[in-house]
A protein has these predicted regions:
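Alpha-helical scaffold/interaction cores of sigma-54-like transcription cofactors
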Residues: 1-527, 531, 536
């Protein structure tokens, strides 16, 4: 097991999950800043119950709260608050939004701590923050709500810090200190900027569009306690309001560590197989399957042939021993309902070696005349679930049949993550730097043939081969010379290789499970329509 600390904030560019005033959102215009329309919230699972509630909140934020962005509200949070810890997040959080609202006539870079010197501004801001704190305490309890300090070069962040320090002093709500993390280490800032630009490759882009280090507003990467203290000291030297708050900040840094290692228990993701429920008090799932198989044996005239009877008994005995009757019933019902809507292939692979599959109409091949073995498909010696391979002319007909049988909430299409593979990544980075396409293509074309035989032999790889930068540097002279000629390309390839590029819908993958089991799984929806749902 491992400790899982999940941040529902994500990055500013990716939206995130929000606490939002829906009425204000509906009245807002396109000209209003983002921080006036939705807010981030950090939610941490401190135990297994909390992890399930966090997954439920994510699911509901997409399925029931989607309005431009996935959202939750106080009521939803309170209903699923057990086992959760909440903090106020970064400058995109609700606390910051309530502060900045007071200065709506200013640009973001004009927000600074000394704006709170005026009581005409200070009092209404603190009143809003106290009301916000009361609502969060009501949702998750006083021991599970924290005010979040961050230390960076944004003057608006120091404005937020000033208000939250005062709020903590007044209410006793504890502070924590965190670091927004948009890239892994301080030297990876340029790779992140390039990563963002790669999503816009349709536009005319070149390396001049990458900012210089001194142009960055802040360096957002994970920091240890000593680095956090150094960041605070820089702010301490710049802003007077930090004077006298040293002990508060030191405690906040230590408290962040304590939350992870003392308040959060070990949690795990349940990866066990969940099948739809079959059977009734009068008839078990295995009895249902047995009746279907016996009826088919009689219908096909096989019940009088001893070799078929023995094979049927062997297979049914193994199925009962392994507890797989629900799997075969589910496959039977899906195929039976969809058979008039689409064409099926005869079946292929080891599944064609099952007489039960043939009798249920899942495959169209009688395995006995061809000597096909049941043991290659299933047996008591096998620890993995059976895998039936067949072809269907209409994928959606199968999915629709599954929805009719088990319900929309029990049939969820699967998402997949598109990653930055080596050859396409090299081409994209080279394009960004204006390197001639012919030169790049000449180098990348033969890479697979040059590298794969050597790399697979050295690494003893038997799985699908994936080109890696280090293997290409070792076994491809053309690749090595290209990287020596254009070192900036190689530098970014090492950092960005296999990073997620986008999320999409798997071409055919579908999860079928009881809705009550899916409740504990993190569900993401791109739209309220179940057909468009994505499971993560």
């Amino acid at each position: 097991t491992q400790k899982i600390v999940i941040d529902a904030e994500n990055e500013v560019e990716q939206g995130g999950h929000v606490i939002e005033d829906e009425e204000e959102t509906k009245r807002s215009s396109a000209n209003k800043p983002e921080w006036k329309r939705y807010y981030h919230l950090v939610v941490i699972a401190k135990n297994q119950v909390g992890l399930g509630n966090l997954f439920t909140l994510v699911k509901k934020s997409y399925k029931h709260g989607f309005y431009r962005f996935p959202r939750i509200d106080y009521k939803m949070l309170k209903e699923h608050s057990e086992g959760l810890i909440v903090s106020t997040a970064c400058v995109g959080g609700l606390a910051s939004g309530l502060i900045y609202r007071q200065f709506s006539g200013l640009r973001f870079d004009e927000l600074r701590p000394d704006l709170m010197n005026s009581l005409d501004d200070y009092n209404p801001v603190m009143s809003r923050l106290e009301n916000m704190a009361d609502q969060f305490v009501d949702c998750v309890g006083r021991d599970n709500f924290f005010l979040e300090l961050q230390f960076n070069d944004l003057s608006a962040q120091h404005l937020t810090n000033r208000c939250l320090i005062d709020l903590s002093t007044k209410t006793g709500i504890p502070l924590i200190a965190t670091a927004d993390s948009h890239f892994p280490t301080s030297d990876k800032w340029q790779a992140r900027e390039l990563y963002k630009k790669l999503g816009w490759m349709g536009a005319k882009l070149d390396q001049s569009m990458l900012p210089k280090k001194e142009e960055l507003k802040c360096m957002l990467y994970p920091k240890n306690a000593a680095q956090m203290w150094d960041e605070f000291k820089q702010g301490h030297n710049q802003y007077d309001f930090y004077h006298g708050s040293e002990e508060l900040v030191r405690d906040a840094i230590e408290r962040t560590h304590d939350i992870t290692w003392q308040k959060c228990e070990d949690t795990w993701i349940d990866t066990s197989v969940k099948l739809p429920h079959f059977g009734t008090p009068e008839k078990s799932a295995f009895r249902m399957l047995s009746d279907l198989v016996k009826e088919a044996m009689i219908r096909e005239g096989l019940a009088v042939k001893p070799v078929y009877v023995e094979r049927m008994k062997e297979e049914m005995s193994d199925i009962k021993y392994l507890g797989y009757e629900a799997y075969f019933l589910a496959m039977y019902k899906i195929f039976h309902l969809a058979e008039n809507r689409t064409l099926f292939g005869p079946g292929r692979g080891s599944g064609a070696g099952s007489l039960v599959n043939y009798l249920l109409g899942i495959t169209q091949i009688d395995p006995l005349p061809y000597g096909l073995l049941w043991s290659r498909f299933l047996g008591r010696h096998r620890t993995s679930w059976p895998d039936i391979d067949t072809d269907a002319g209409d994928r959606d007909a199968l999915i629709d049949a599954s929805r009719e049988l088990f319900g929309d909430d029990a049939v969820i299409p699967v998402s997949n993550f598109n990653t930055l593979k080596l050859k396409s990544l090299v081409k994209d980075i080279a394009k960004f730097y204006g390197i001639n396409f012919t030169e790049v293509n000449k180098m990348t074309g033969p890479l697979q043939d040059e590298v794969m035989p050597h790399a697979k032999d050295e690494n003893q790889e038997k799985s699908v081969f994936v080109l890696k930068h280090e293997d290409c540097m070792k076994y491809s002279k053309g690749y090595r010379e290209f990287m020596e000629k254009y070192p900036e390309v190689g530098k970014h390839v090492e950092t960005l290789f296999m990073e997620n590029r986008s999320i999409g819908r798997h071409a055919g993958g579908v999860i079928i499970a009881p809705p009550e089991d899916l409740e504990s799984t993190c569900l993401l929806y791109t739209s309220p329509s179940p057909r468009d749902g994505l499971l993560s």
